[in-house]
């Protein structure tokens, strides 16, 4: 076997979780509002605008970022007053959560702040679709994750490997919790890693493939940490990946299905997403590499008979492109896929009209992916940028 090329790097960031910074920002904004009221001014919030018009790809940092366009929300404005009130309500709720060391889900945050305004028939919130955007506004205003404000989403994803995790007063090794590993919580800001005995992290799209690798002893034999995203990576998983790379120096290798959905999962982990452009510097990991599945794998490993047809209408047919074909053409225009390696893969997918799943490797044998496919590609540096 060739000499391993994957090894830990020098950390670029330090563990920096500090609830006090959120409390400080809340206090500063609240004091400014109070001062405006005392001075007879119209209180306002300046909030970075959401939407495509305020999003760009930064070539230097290789991240999808938010621009500098702002929208101003006034108290003494009929069109703004309701959202202004809702913003202050959520700010007060966040202060209480952080001060008391408690966490709440998005749904709990909605219900906790929903009530009828005294003397009226008006509710503060009618639906969670009103409270969620306010929380996103605060993220953009403060430049922090909602998880740092102690507001969480449902947990999804798990890790397995020789890494010691400290979660509050608990400390445990993620390779000694059974084959199910450690479920990644919605909030990972407070998690610390006293001991890491792996060379790199392998991010795996499907739980079935992650389970296969664990059963075949891949993490122990290859000295790797398995991170199962279970589909599109959650915010908690993306933040964990970012922290493991920048704070602990772990190289990140991504393993997904060879289809437009899998490639988008990789894109989101690597460059961030348009919807969360304001958090790319906390969630994205531009140094990530892609091991597969690729179109080249189909012929190299004799998988022609286990491919699946792309869904939709090809661009050269009436009514096309639609479905997978349309998505691939969109991905070909992503700035971060504007290199010959990725253009080749996407063009081959269009030309052949096929997709290839991770589980297709079982056609060779159940252990093939763990004992041949991944070790060969990773140790040979056969990775896409």
Swiss-Prot record:
Homodimer. Heterotetramer of two Top6A and two Top6B chains. One of its GO terms (molecular function) is DNA binding. It catalyses: ATP-dependent breakage, passage and rejoining of double-stranded DNA. SUPFAM superfamilies: DNA topoisomerase IV, alpha subunit. GO terms for biological process: DNA topological change. It holds the Pfam family TP6A_N. Its EC number is 5.6.2.2. Relaxes both positive and negative superturns and exhibits a strong decatenase activity. It comes from the Archaea. Belongs to the TOP6A family. Transmembrane segments: none annotated. This is Type 2 DNA topoisomerase 6 subunit A. InterPro entries: Spo11/TopoVI_A, Spo11/TopoVI_A_N, Spo11/TopoVI_A_sf, TopoVI_A, TOPRIM_Topo6A/Spo11, WH-like_DNA-bd_sf. Its cofactor is Mg(2+). GO terms for cellular component: chromosome. The active site is at 111 (o-(5'-phospho-dna)-tyrosine intermediate). Keywords: ATP-binding, DNA-binding, Isomerase, Magnesium, Metal-binding, Nucleotide-binding, Topoisomerase. Mg(2+) binds at residues 205, 257. It is an enzyme of class 5 (isomerase).
